[in-house]
Structure formats: structure tokens, C-alpha cells
Amino acid sequence: MSEWRTRREKIIQLLTESREPLTIDEIAAMVGEDDRRKIIEDLEHIAKTVRKEGKRLLMEPARCNKCGYVFKSARVRPPSRCPRCKSEWIQPPRFTIR
């Protein structure tokens, strides 16, 4: 790829080459983007883009660090509170491309 890549191309390359799944904050820091909402928007679009190439954007779901509740929603946006114990100590979802 050339040196001039879009933010989405950078995210795709980052998620494809990373050994461990990455959080939205880690992705934002690595591509130099301050707005997490843009990264969330990009991830939703990237899921469609990589599917055309025969790959998948995989998401490790968010989890409550207090009670262990695993969020079932396939939403990219991280939850704010646990529905079971109301804790805000949430491990954010992690993403990778395989």
C-alpha cells in the first residue's frame, strides 16, 4: 500500500496485522484520531468492506469486570453500564480481522 492511505485503510491494516484484538481507544491512538465516534463509524463500514474480500471483522464482546456479565449485543459501541450489577467498570469490546 502507498504511504497515502485513508483512515479506514489504516484501521484494516492494523486489525489484520495485530496479534491481539484491539479496543476502540487503542485503534484511535494508533491511527491518530481523537474522535472515538469516527472509529466506531469506520468499524461498522469496515465490517462490510472486508466481507467482500472473504474476511471478517471479529468482535470480542464487552464484559463487566465486576460480575462477569458478557454483553450479547453485536453493537460496536461500548456499553456504559452493566444491566445486571449496574457497574460502570466495563471491559470494552475488542476487534480483529481474520
What are these regions (language model features)?
Residues 34-56:
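Charge-enriched amphipathic alpha-helical scaffolds
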Residues 63-67, 82-85:
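Short cysteine-rich clusters marking metal-coordination/redox-active sites
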Residues 26-28:
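A short acidic, leucine-rich amphipathic alpha-helix
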Residues 60, 78:
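Short metal-coordination and nucleic-acid-contact micro-motifs, chiefly zinc-binding Cys/His arrays
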Residues 71, 89:
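Cys/His-rich microdomains that often coordinate metals
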Residues 90-98:
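Short metal-binding segments enriched for Cys and/or His
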Residues 1-10, 72:
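Short alpha-helical segments that sit at the start of domains
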Residues 16-19:
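Short helix-capping/hinge SLiMs at alpha-helix to coil transitions
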